[in-house]
């Protein structure tokens, strides 16, 4: 078996983002475009990366003009390295606060299960499965 790298997973994730995996809220506001494909994908992308590497899920607040505009999710690996595959979605001067580690929700990540499952399956297909499985 050929080992997977973070670059392999990053490329597979980015190639798998689409309107049908975007957060419905971001999609309804017209925030998602093919020019900004990571928009509305931070939560489920962090879960998919966690599927491959484990570690911790990180969450921070998103602020613009001094007002909170939601939350942002990324990963911290067991080594302590933090990886954020969707940070580039913030193009309007948004600021993400320092994150805090949270436990992965048990079971289905409602209400985004369908989008998570679709993204996860696309990534897994592009990579030929999960390592060691």
Residue ranges and their predicted role:
Residues 1-133:
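A structural boundary/capping signal
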């Amino acid at each position: 078996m050929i080992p997977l790298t973070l670059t392999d997973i990053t490329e597979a994730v980015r190639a798998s983002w689409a309107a049908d995996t975007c957060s419905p809220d971001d999609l309804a506001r017209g925030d998602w475009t093919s020019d900004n494909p990571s928009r509305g994908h931070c939560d489920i992308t962090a879960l998919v990366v966690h599927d491959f590497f484990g570690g911790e899920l990180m969450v921070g607040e998103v602020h613009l003009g001094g007002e909170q505009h939601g939350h942002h999710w990324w990963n911290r690996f067991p080594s302590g390295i933090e990886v954020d595959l969707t940070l580039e979605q913030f193009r309007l001067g948004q600021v993400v606060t320092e994150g805090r580690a949270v436990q992965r929700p048990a079971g289905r990540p409602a209400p985004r299960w369908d989008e998570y499952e679709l993204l996860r399956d696309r990534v897994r297909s592009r990579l030929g499965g999960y390592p060691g499985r």
